[in-house]
Amino acid sequence: MTDQIAQNSARPAWETSDHIDDQVVNELRQKFGPDAFTFQPTRTGMPVVWVKREQLIEVMQYLKSLPKPYVMLYDLHGVDERVRTHRQGLPAADFSVFYHLISLDRNKDIMLKVALSEKDLNLPTLTSIFPNSNWYEREVWDMFGIVFNGHPNLRRIMMLPNWEGHPLRKDYPARATEFDPYVLTKQKEDLEMESLTFKPEEWGMKRGTENEDFMFLNLGPNHPSSHGAFRIILQLDGEEIVNCVPDVGYHHRGAEKMGERQSWHSYIPYTDRIEYLGGCVNEMPYVLAVEKLAGIEVPERVKVIRVMLSELFRINSHLLYISTFIQDVGAMTPVFFAFTDRQKVYDIVEAITGFRMHPAWFRIGGVAHDLPKGWERLLREFLDWMPKRLDSYVKAALQNSILKGRTIGVASYNAKEALDWGVTGAGLRATGVEFDVRKWRPYSGYENFEFEIPVASNGDCYDRVMLKVEELRQSLRILEQCYKNMPAGPFKADHPLTTPPPKERTLQHIETMINHFLQVSWGPVMPANESFQMVEATKGINSYYLTSDGSTMSYRTRIRTPSFAHLQQIPAVIRGSLVSDLIVYLGSIDFVMSDVDR
């Protein structure tokens, strides 16, 4: 792993490359021929390979069967290519679908793309190779109208069942003012409610057997244990779960569509709200991806400040997760303790950024302003306070015999199952896979920090919560190093696309002042290219895949969140368990619906 990290860091993150020297490219050429593919130079940091639709299944099977296989379908989505101007050298396409695969043995990624004509929008499903492609293919159909032949149940997932149109197409309106006035008649309301009625036959479920009928129970979308606007339809035989269907989309806001109508700079506040507990952690992949497009290298002080804010929000999120998990099992007191501790985190965040939950504080090329006087004292007080409090959570609640009895051995899965379903974060590390982006693919200077990656082996509810406790301790270690080793220097990069540019120079240089005016009013113009950045977020791996067409706005903003993949796995894990086990399992996943629905 160390050699691979060194290899990855040798090439500048913003360098445009087709990666034809990558080992997997040679393997593909040897198998399918030297002229079988088109290689696209990008700033994604991985080979981007256009394949023919007829070859897609064979190529996928080959990549998954290599000696060092690509075991995870990390992401799958689409792009409306019809009005894109900068696509020289690429196959003709009205639409394209991309498949992002990860190989843990190589610590490498590859992206496959398929070009499609508007008159022939169909592809073969990958559900027999990667089971987690199910929801991703449903979302691509929902957003673009691309059909996946052989899909077990191709239907809408984000929008209402009777929704008209496909929102991520370029000819679909992006603003409410572009629609006719909305009128909800009684007849329409009845139709909307009827469309949400669950029909077991549509999902391959039986209503009963010769001897007994099954009960179908709605858990949510308004239920304290569903952790948000989330509905699960349960097929029950008494208390035993025969099968279930997660129903998401109630919290969908069109975050990716908004990215096409906001400037690169003005989209930053939206990133905070993708996973509304993560704060600056959510800003990190976006600004890093934009900086790759711009070719910006930020100062060391900026890197450490960003790490410090990210780890503060990681602690904040983990505290809420641990305490609400304990509450789901039946204990109330730890929640109130946790909110006391989280208040201390928010006090530090507010002192530094001016805001609490959603600071929108990272900037393209730096941060909004320098650290204030006295930040060291606040951080020092928190570092002295938190370790003992963490010990009390473990002693008072997590070592409780009742909690252990409810969680040990419950909702367990192994590493292969986790990888098949695209699980990342603590859910993957609980199965023994030591994959943490901060260590394996360091960003923002994480390679300069000393910390461990906690892992477990049972993959059950108890392992997942205890891993979060250990991750909290490691975050405190990182914060201690930020406190002791904060570099001096500027808080913004000296680069023309730093947004907004350093204010001081606008008073001395007319060109800088004009540049400042244009970037604040219209937004910076990013070079036409594609970039990608993943980070170890609070709930797993979060990433942004950005496409620039040489404009002040993104041509396509793809947001891959961990919770979407984690909820898709629920039926495979919980079948055969009790309803009470489902409640504990939901509490152990660590999700919020804004992260799922975007």
Curated annotation (Swiss-Prot):
GO terms for molecular function: NAD binding; NADH dehydrogenase (ubiquinone) activity; NADH:ubiquinone reductase (non-electrogenic) activity; quinone binding. It is a peripheral membrane protein. PROSITE patterns: COMPLEX1_30K, COMPLEX1_49K. Its main location: membrane. HAMAP family: NDH1_NuoC, NDH1_NuoCD_1, NDH1_NuoD. NDH-1 shuttles electrons from NADH, via FMN and iron-sulfur (Fe-S) centers, to quinones in the respiratory chain. The immediate electron acceptor for the enzyme in this species is believed to be ubiquinone. Couples the redox reaction to proton translocation (for every two electrons transferred, four hydrogen ions are translocated across the cytoplasmic membrane), and thus conserves the redox energy in a proton gradient. This is NADH-quinone oxidoreductase subunit C/D. It comes from Proteus mirabilis (strain HI4320).
